[in-house]
């Protein structure tokens, strides 16, 4: 068992939209990511996805519903199959919780797709 200090973990990398694996439990992954600008529209066919904003502000744009704006300390769970796009005007630090095999771009293959996540030290 090792504790994770979120501030130190986020300070250990700078790359945007490139999740880092912070831990795993019961087939679920805890991922940390820095975000700025627009991500890709995508959905996850078989997995719900939790977005928790640690710092900054993040908007989850939705094709078929109203966008959800998350402030620091707020989270939302995007149900499986719901097309969404995370967007932020300035850098946000986010924690993601989802099944370990979930690909960051879901059903979309792009230059931002990450298949082998870097483990935090």
Residue ranges and their predicted role:
Residues 34-35, 44-63, 97:
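Short, conserved beta-strand element in jelly-roll/cupin
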Residues 26, 54-55, 71-72, 90:
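A cytosolic small-molecule/anion-sensing beta-strand core signal
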Residues 64-81:
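Short acidic-glycine-tyrosine-enriched beta hairpin
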Residues 15-16, 29-45:
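Conserved short histidine dyad/triad with adjacent acidic residue
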Residues 28-29, 58, 66, 82:
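Short acidic/polar mixed-charge low-complexity motifs
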Residues 80-108:
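Ligand-binding loop in jelly-roll beta-barrel domains
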Residues 1-31, 109-121:
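A short, N-terminal "cap"/entry segment at the start of jelly-roll beta-barrel domains
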